[in-house]
């Protein structure tokens, strides 16, 4: 039994939750001033909680949609005979309908997504050339909105590393993602496909920044594809795409690492709910007398004109967030 002297030295047990927890820890560990440590921990939690909301929640929502897409595709694959295959006989027709509605909903809620100028996309085959943000999520929104609004399906050319990512085979197949040899692209266009490509690719995605610099280098293969397939080129740009997700590509070591191993190992941050508007420019018609170099320069100028017209440079995350509260532009 505890004696009266021992009881008097310990004093009363504290009544507040934090003080009581500190008291228990102090008695158990023998460490003094545990209440100060707990108070500091509570303060840190209070400070870091908004940061966790800003950085973790958007990523969690995105990956929830992505994993939901994969789950729906696996369910569809098992039960696809019970879904509508559509008039085209496409066995993935029902899956496409599910995915485009999921991603269009994500775009509407998270970015207030708008698509402008889709009347510039002809009913004939065409090659869409777009600026590549840090993430291709704006292309997903565009593809979904175009299919919902125009019933027009757009295929896209992706870097070879995408096809090596585990678990994406079905997702890639349903979204019409293609590996990009010139012959494959020309064949797809001659079959009547609408095809999208970003000449800047992964390098532009990782190492362009809020100045929206187009980083094509000497790439002109896309122009030769359009010439060989005898199709128009259509420029496309998404406003604020760099403010949605930022990269640390300005750090030289990441650029050197990419050039050595050609894998996109560059940290990203953000997933901010900024305003996204995709703008489709006027078509550059097929010209049998133009060279690939001339068509490349012409396309780059058209894309730069879209950026200059619709993007305030340098991009600003706060301004892009505030644009969510501006009057919604009427979609074409």
UniProtKB/Swiss-Prot annotation:
GO terms for cellular component: endoplasmic reticulum membrane; membrane. GO terms for molecular function: phospholipid:diacylglycerol acyltransferase activity. CDD domains: LPLAT_MGAT-like. Its EC number is 2.3.1.-, 2.3.1.20, 2.3.1.22. Residues 32-45 are cytoplasmic. It comes from the Eukaryota. Pfam families: Acyltransferase (PF01553). It is found in: Endoplasmic reticulum membrane. The active site is at 132. It is a multi-pass membrane protein. Residues 1-10, 67-332 are lumenal. Keywords: Acyltransferase, Endoplasmic reticulum, Glycoprotein, Lipid metabolism, Membrane, Transferase, Transmembrane, Transmembrane helix. Its main location: endoplasmic reticulum. GO terms for biological process: triglyceride biosynthetic process. Glycans are attached at residues 5, 289. Catalytic subunit of the alternative triglyceride biosynthesis pathway, which mediates formation of triacylglycerol from diacylglycerol and membrane phospholipids. Synthesizes triacylglycerol at the expense of membrane phospholipids, such as phosphatidylcholine (PC) and its ether-linked form (ePC), thereby altering the composition of membranes. The alternative triglyceride biosynthesis pathway is probably required to provide the energy required for rapid growth when fuel sources are limiting. It maintains mitochondrial function during periods of extracellular lipid starvation. This is DGAT1/2-independent enzyme synthesizing storage lipids. It comes from Gallus gallus.
